[in-house]
Amino acid sequence: WIMGHMVNNIKQIDEFVNLGSNAIETDVSFDKKANPEYTYHGTPCDCGRDCLRWEYFNDFVKALRTATTPGNSKYDKLFLVVFDLKTSSLYDYQASEAGTKLAKNLLQHYWNNGNNGGRAYIILSIPNLKHYKLITGFQQTLKDEGHAELLDKVGYDFSGNDDIGDVQKTYEKAGVTGHVWQSDGITNCLLRSFTRINAAVANRDSANGIINKVYYWTVDKRQTTRDTLDANVDGIMTNYPDITVEILNEDAYKTKFRIATYEDNPWETFKE
């Protein structure tokens, strides 16, 4: 999965897909009442990027629905969306409410109330383990609204670079048993060791681990891309998807990896 980083403006959806992304990451900021408000990152952000691009959340989600509905030219090119949920602005007790409001919003504006809505898989990426009730609030709301089937399209990620054991315990508290992606990384302005990514991959590949897929961010340089592929990740989050495509076509990688398609289930652990 080639995950376009910080796609917060409607025009950027096309831009990143055209460069080779089959997945995008979008920042979601919340208002004081825990409603998803903007797709916005703000400063500081990755080196070489405009941190201030934004849309109203509803407008972005409607455009995303159009792009990921059969008949659209992007439909079979873009099939995974990571919502990077900026919950640090919320009180801990608001996490469940944020999940409820996010679910209602996506149900209406993305899934079109279950009537021929967008088809992409969605990952809810949460920066704080304490906010695990966002997941339970989200799930319960879709069930209450009569659309539990949409949870087949939803996965989860804790993005705070916490200890993998603590992440696993938090999923147990939330009652999550699958659809788990694990991120690791740091802004492209800095370097980070592969210690934790290796631990995440080990959990993914172990018999009793909870992780299904592992991705690393933000990977922009060619050598870092090679190092990341050598760590056996499932996804690379990048500001330059065309560089990821280029490296995947190198002799060392083109027989070992392929770019995911719509037919690939992002919740299944890949077994060699």
Swiss-Prot record:
GO biological process: killing of cells of another organism; lipid catabolic process
Cited SUPFAM superfamilies: PLC-like phosphodiesterases
Cellular component terms per the entry's GO annotation: extracellular region
Coiled coil segments of this chain: none
CDD domains hit by this protein: GDPD_like_SMaseD_PLD
Biological role stated in the UniProt entry: Dermonecrotic toxins cleave the phosphodiester linkage between the phosphate and headgroup of certain phospholipids (sphingolipid and lysolipid substrates), forming an alcohol (often choline) and a cyclic phosphate. This toxin acts on sphingomyelin (SM). It may also act on ceramide phosphoethanolamine (CPE), lysophosphatidylcholine (LPC) and lysophosphatidylethanolamine (LPE), but not on lysophosphatidylserine (LPS), and lysophosphatidylglycerol (LPG). It acts by transphosphatidylation, releasing exclusively cyclic phosphate products as second products.
Active site per database record: H5, H41 (nucleophile)
One function term, GO molecular function aspect: metal ion binding
Species for this entry: Loxosceles variegata
Predominant location category: secreted
Compartments in which it is found: Secreted
Binding site for Mg(2+): E25, D27, D84
Cofactor, how bound (note): Binds 1 Mg(2+) ion per subunit.
Cofactors that this protein relies on: Mg(2+)
Disulfide cysteine pairs (residue numbers): C45-C51, C47-C189
EC number(s) stated in the UniProt entry for this protein: 4.6.1.-
Record-given protein name: Dermonecrotic toxin LvSicTox-alphaIC1biii
Catalytic activity: an N-(acyl)-sphingosylphosphocholine = an N-(acyl)-sphingosyl-1,3-cyclic phosphate + choline; an N-(acyl)-sphingosylphosphoethanolamine = an N-(acyl)-sphingosyl-1,3-cyclic phosphate + ethanolamine; a 1-acyl-sn-glycero-3-phosphocholine = a 1-acyl-sn-glycero-2,3-cyclic phosphate + choline; a 1-acyl-sn-glycero-3-phosphoethanolamine = a 1-acyl-sn-glycero-2,3-cyclic phosphate + ethanolamine
Keywords: Cytolysis, Dermonecrotic toxin, Disulfide bond, Hemolysis, Lipid degradation, Lipid metabolism, Lyase, Magnesium, Metal-binding, Secreted, Toxin
Entry comment describing in which tissues the protein is expressed: Expressed by the venom gland.
Similarity field: Belongs to the arthropod phospholipase D family. Class II subfamily.
